Curated annotation (Swiss-Prot):
It is found in: Bacterial microcompartment. Has a very strong preference for NAD(+) over NADP(+). The keyword Nucleotide-binding does not apply. GO terms for biological process: ethanolamine catabolic process. It holds the Pfam family Aldedh. Pathway: Amine and polyamine degradation; ethanolamine degradation. Interacts with EutS, which targets it to the interior of the BMC. This is Acetaldehyde dehydrogenase (acetylating) EutE. It comes from Escherichia coli (strain K12). GO terms for molecular function: acetaldehyde dehydrogenase (acetylating) activity; aldehyde dehydrogenase (NAD+) activity. It comes from the Bacteria. Its EC number is 1.2.1.10. Belongs to the EutE/PduP family. PANTHER family: ALDEHYDE DEHYDROGENASE-RELATED.
Length: 467
């Protein structure tokens, strides 16, 4: 065969590929499609392979193994692509989601028997579920949602934030490859090659999708609420306060607060966002925080920093956070005002008033406002005010059971952590399962596979009651 013959064969093969009637294959890697229509069609076919609980278990086991195996690579890619967060903390999140997200074991049918017979209540899938994921926790959210939604019998079409599309697509590809290698269906997890706002908006009303899961900020949640005609499960913003009273173990509180408020540079909505401390222990607490790789700013330095971090401050004191500084390292933020801090610095903190924009606004960066109050009653009241009715997360450090009980009742958040960092409420250092989707706007709270099922009732009249 001469060169001309080879060229003719190549042309014929290419022509055949271009004219094929099959849906377009993944354009980059497994599960990444050129069009939304093809992605959803592939996920719909794949979902039929999840009828068997054994197949769901097989797929989840593969996801857990792949998620943990590639946790560091995905963490590094996330920081490289988005510029936000810390590799070690993202690694910890990825591993935690792979290990700690519940699978099919949390789904139990209910059986009711009585004089009139037997009723069975089963957990049914929705089918293809749309999942909108954030740039702040990209790989961790993909791993978590993949396990939860597959456990519930669903396949998933992901709409990742465009700023984190590479790491999100990489995570989807790696998990798909693991599922297929283990003997599971192709394309249980899909996305599009070029995700954008229009893609997400199309998913809000896309035919054949019954459930929409949104993990993100206030804007995307409100957009979904406004435009979707589907069942919506939404995880939104928070401004978690942490209260320290005069009975607290201050050394433990200082360590927990710095750890939580600096974790992944404070880009998790559940991280501590404002510290409220009783005046009698405030100075000692802040001194101990400085021993935990935190640096205290002066009022003048905070005044310099405010216009760098916040724009368009309204009459409530709430501002728009500059995206350039979300999730950036404390050292880089300090350098923006010419301040050099030790390399190991994880957190900047500063005393403010309760009305200061730093206290009112969810900053999502390692800058923590500290507000003094006269007593624990004032602290709890201020915590409720600054939490802003998000019902997301709060924490308290105290040895007084009555004080903790009062705050637990008053704050009314989905997660309330006592004597530990807020991330303990996500299974990172505390008991309980992990999630990256904390659905406070729609009320489901800390999600699991149980959140993503349809309950179906099957009734047998006058039979099968055997006692």
């Amino acid at each position: 065969m001469n060169q001309q013959d080879i060229e003719q064969v190549v042309k014929a093969v290419l022509l055949k590929m271009q004219s094929s009637d099959t849906p377009s294959a993944a354009v980059h890697e497994m599960g990444v499609f050129a069009s939304l229509d093809d992605a959803v069609a592939a996920a719909k076919v794949a979902q039929q392979g999840l009828k068997s609980v054994a197949m769901r278990q097989l797929a989840i086991a593969a996801i857990r193994e792949a998620g943990e195996k590639h946790a560091r690579d995905l963490a590094e890619l996330a920081v490289s692509e988005t510029g936000m967060g810390r590799v070690e903390d993202k690694f910890a999140k990825n591993v935690a989601q792979a290990r700690g997200t519940p699978g099919v074991e949390c789904l139990s049918p209910q059986v009711l028997t009585g004089d009139n017979g037997l009723t069975l209540i089963e957990n049914a899938p929705w089918g293809v579920v749309a999942s909108v994921t954030p740039s702040t926790n990209p790989a961790a959210t993909v791993i978590n949602n993949a396990i939860s939604l597959i456990a519930a019998g669903n396949s998933v079409i992901f709409a990742p934030h465009p700023a984190a599309k590479k790491v999100s697509q990489r995570a989807i590809t790696l998990l798909n490859q693991a599922i297929v290698a283990a003997g599971g269906p192709e394309n249980l997890l899909v996305t599009v090659a070029n995700p954008d706002i229009e893609t997400a908006q199309r998913l809000f009303k896309f035919p054949g999708i019954g459930l929409l899961v949104v993990t993100g900020g206030e804007a995307v949640v409100e957009a979904a609420r406004k435009h979707t005609n589907k069942r919506l499960i939404a995880a939104g913003a928070g401004n978690p306060p942490v209260v320290v009273d005069e009975t607290a173990d201050l050394a433990r509180a200082a360590q927990s607060i710095v750890k939580g408020a600096s974790f992944d540079n404070n880009i998790i909505c559940a991280d501590e966002k404002v510290l409220i401390v009783v005046d009698s222990v405030a100075d000692e607490l802040m001194r101990l925080m400085e021993g935990q790789h935190a640096v205290k700013l002066t009022a003048e330095q905070a005044q310099q920093l405010q216009p760098v971090l916040l724009k368009n401050i309204d009459e409530r004191g709430k501002g728009t956070v500059s995206r350039d500084w979300v999730g950036r390292d404390a050292g880089k933020i300090a350098a923006a005002i010419g301040l050099k801090v030790p390399q190991e610095t994880r957190l900047l903190f500063v005393e403010t008033t309760a009305e200061h924009p730093f206290a009112v606004t969810e900053l999502m960066m390692p800058v923590l406002p500290v507000v003094r109050v006269a007593n624990v009653a004032d602290a709890i009241a201020l915590a409720v005010k600054l939490e802003g009715g998000c019902h997301h997360t709060a924490a308290m450090h105290s040895r007084n059971i009555e004080n903790m009980n009062q705050m637990a009742n008053a704050i009314d958040t989905s997660i309330f952590v006592k004597n530990g960092p807020c991330i303990a409420g996500l299974g990172l250092g505390g008991e309980g399962w992990t999630t990256m989707t904390i659905t406070t706007p729609t009320g489901e709270g800390v999600t699991s596979a149980r959140t993503f099922v349809r309950l179906r009732r099957c009734v047998l009249v006058d039979a099968f009651r055997i006692v």
